[in-house]
């Protein structure tokens, strides 16, 4: 949905009513796309918090797997807060100190009532939590590039977070860290960016989801094909 706000998608005002509301920043409380982002995002955050809460009880069984799970859960919690924040709050810089309202921060398990009553934190507080989770995940995630999240993905998201926060010095720092790692290179054939899929990774890919044919069943990939513009 953040791609809509960046004008990387076309929307049809008639057939893509909910998406068009997001693109023009005229959505209401009944917008299904926005509601889905909020509900699914916080559902993922809650699942990550549950794993993090119970992880100490089982980490002795397999310490390496426990470290990996902790890193992955911190990464998921961070990027979900980040994407929700970008959709439901004013951007960083709206106030000089980013004290304007952001979204609720959820980093622990609570009852449904407690979660519903969680107040909105400031944008600065949300960004600080996101950055803290990502920095911790970098220390826990592996360097290998496969279908699971790696430290490079956490670094790449830190680039995006700092850039969105208008902290360009730190954004540049993490961009340089990825570039200087020599783990990634630009594709010589630009068509490979769109033609390579599944286990056949693009050299440029830092973090991607692995899809199987059954993932086409909900029609979402078709929608992306029609809506996304190359940038």
Language model: regions and residue ranges:
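Conserved, well-structured interaction surfaces
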Residues: 14-88, 121, 136-142
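Short coil/linker segments at helix-helix boundaries
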Residues: 87-128
């Amino acid at each position: 949905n953040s791609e809509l706000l960046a004008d990387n998608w076309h929307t049809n005002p008639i057939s893509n009513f909910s998406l068009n509301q997001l693109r023009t920043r005229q959505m209401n409380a009944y917008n299904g796309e926005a509601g889905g982002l909020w509900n699914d995002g916080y559902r993922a955050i809650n699942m990550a918090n549950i794993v993090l809460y119970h992880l100490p009880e089982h980490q002795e069984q397999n310490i390496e797997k426990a470290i990996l799970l902790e890193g992955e859960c911190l990464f998921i919690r961070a990027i979900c807060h980040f994407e929700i924040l970008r959709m439901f709050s004013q951007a960083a810089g709206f106030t000089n100190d980013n004290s304007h309202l952001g979204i609720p921060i959820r980093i622990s398990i609570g009852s449904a009532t407690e979660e519903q009553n969680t107040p909105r934190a400031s944008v600065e507080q949300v960004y600080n939590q996101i950055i803290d989770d990502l920095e911790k995940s970098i220390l826990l995630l592996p360097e290998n590039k496969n279908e699971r999240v790696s430290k490079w993905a956490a670094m790449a998201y830190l680039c995006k977070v700092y850039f969105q926060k208008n902290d360009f010095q730190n954004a540049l720092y993490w961009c340089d860290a990825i570039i200087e790692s020599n783990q990634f290179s630009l594709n010589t054939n630009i068509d490979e960016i769109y033609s390579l899929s599944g286990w056949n990774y693009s050299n440029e890919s830092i973090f991607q989801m692995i899809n199987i044919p059954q993932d086409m069943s909900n029609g979402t990939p078709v929608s992306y094909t029609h809506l996304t513009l190359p940038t």
